[in-house]
């Protein structure tokens, strides 16, 4: 039924947005480029997002597909070894980093839990590297603004109207023009709401507390700033919240780009075991796993690519201390 509804939307008349297109003939800057992050092994998603983009025209009447460039995503399956820290990625973060963005008033973790290093999952590292790659593309471009999309998005009803209203309010205020490095158009607020200040009727500035990077407008100056702030420490949508104080971040009054629910996510969320230990699985529900494991140790064997990383994540959520993706046991475990 969900897929049928998504297909039926495409029978509606195409919409036009004054925010997209070449800006040489416009009163204020426009979004001149769209980047879609897409894995080489998922061409069907690229086809779907292209169909989505064809439903919207820029201010001149051209399809948004004409402004769109596919950016090949980094594939975690191609990592030959666990990625190490480099100039772009620091693959360790802490529970304290997470709770700064999304506090959990019911949970009382001790200092040891707060400061323990959490390794990013390989898919999280791949996602971060993909976004960083697009930032470099934007920073080197001649375009003032670019829309960055992940390949599982869809434009919600009223997308063009809400975006045009926000864009007009941002740029049509004379000396009080709202400047931004990042404009979130797809996001989820933390459970208790993001602390924010409304700059206009359709635009607010968050202090922190916005999840997802599935759809956002990035300025060239914003891309340059993000690259200067590297390395990314933790999942990229978490890390970027920690940079809000040094960036001009805005968001549309509500999320106007959604993520499709009819595709399988390949991400592994490294924070889940730590949230489980303090009694929280995610922002929606309390942990069900409070009993310490009765059987130990547990060994699991399988060929590469058979899902051992996912099994280790599941065992961690059940309270086990895990070593995974190893060819031999570390000396400390013998």
Predicted regions and their residues:
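An acidic/histidine-cluster motif and surrounding catalytic segment
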Residues: 2-149, 153-291
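PAPS-dependent sulfotransferase catalytic core
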Residues: 288-334
């Amino acid at each position: 039924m969900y897929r049928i509804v998504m297909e039926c939307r495409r029978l509606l008349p195409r919409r036009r947005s004054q925010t997209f297109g070449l800006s040489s003939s416009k009163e204020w800057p426009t979004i001149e480029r769209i980047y879609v992050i897409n894995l080489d092994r998922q061409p069907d998603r690229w086809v779907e997002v292209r169909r989505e983009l064809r439903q919207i025209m820029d201010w001149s009447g051209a399809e948004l597909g004409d402004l769109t460039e596919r950016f090949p995503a980094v594939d975690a399956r191609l990592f030959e070894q666990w990625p190490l820290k480099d100039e772009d990625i620091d693959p360790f973060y802490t529970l304290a980093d997470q709770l700064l963005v999304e506090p959990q008033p019911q949970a009382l973790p001790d200092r040891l839990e707060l400061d323990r290093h959490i390794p990013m999952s390989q898919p999280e590292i791949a996602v971060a590297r993909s976004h960083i790659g697009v930032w470099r593309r934007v920073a080197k471009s001649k375009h003032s603004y670019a829309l960055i999309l992940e390949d599982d998005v869809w434009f919600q009803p009223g997308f063009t109207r809400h975006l045009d209203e926000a864009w007009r309010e941002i740029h049509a205020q004379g000396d009080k023009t709202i400047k931004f490095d990042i404009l979130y158009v797809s996001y989820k607020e933390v459970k208790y709401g993001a602390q924010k200040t409304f700059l206009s009727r359709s635009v607010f500035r968050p202090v922190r507390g916005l999840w997802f990077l599935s759809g956002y407008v990035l300025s060239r100056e914003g891309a340059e700033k993000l690259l200067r702030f590297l390395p990314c420490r933790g999942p990229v949508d978490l890390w970027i919240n920690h940079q809000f104080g040094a960036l001009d971040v805005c968001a549309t009054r509500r999320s106007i780009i959604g993520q499709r629910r009819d595709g399988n996510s390949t991400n592994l969320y490294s924070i889940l075991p730590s949230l489980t230990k303090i009694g929280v699985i995610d922002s929606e529900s309390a942990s069900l796993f409070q009993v310490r494991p009765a059987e130990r140790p547990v060994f699991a064997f399988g060929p590469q690519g058979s899902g051992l990383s996912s099994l280790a994540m599941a065992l961690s959520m059940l309270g086990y201390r895990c070593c995974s993706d190893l060819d031999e046991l570390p000396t400390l475990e013998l």
